[in-house]
């Protein structure tokens, strides 16, 4: 499918505690339908219902979709796996392209000026990146909040409880939005293989092998 044919996009993100699904018009970023459920332990369970509800809000069906955009993190292993596997499955089943984007870019790309973006990385750490007028200049990375260098940032966006750890004004957006995800795509490029941004080893530990 050529770039000019892509009009209606399914955007999903499971890199944060929010399970986000939305239907977006590519050319003007108008959100036709959106559902968000905040539940860090139910990404897999909530994503499909949210996708179907967003389609219903937009009065569309799966057959009306031209592309899928998915946030590839950084984020926890289990959450990312749910969103990226679903995006790949939708693309394969519908025969449409799937584009992966940095979830932090879906937040930072909607900011102006010098902005720090942070999201929850668990283990008392944050995923972060710095932006200047919506363009990422540093990151993504994962650190304890105290070890994050805000640099020239004049504001902080992202997870409110973690943004509050910095001596900076908090601004929106607080999570990746469907419009932000679609805006983060370079539509001039061909879709590339989806690569998750874990930035560290999964929390789950392998079981010991009995001998």
From Swiss-Prot:
Keywords: Signal. Gene3D superfamilies: 3.30.420.40. InterPro entries: ATPase_NBD, Gcp-like_dom, T6A_TsaB. Residues 1-20 form the signal peptide. This is Uncharacterized protein Rv3421c. PANTHER family: TRNA N6-ADENOSINE THREONYLCARBAMOYLTRANSFERASE, TRNA THREONYLCARBAMOYLADENOSINE BIOSYNTHESIS PROTEIN TSAB. The keyword Manganese does not apply. One of its GO terms (biological process) is tRNA threonylcarbamoyladenosine modification. To M.leprae ML0378. GO terms for cellular component: cytosol; peptidoglycan-based cell wall.
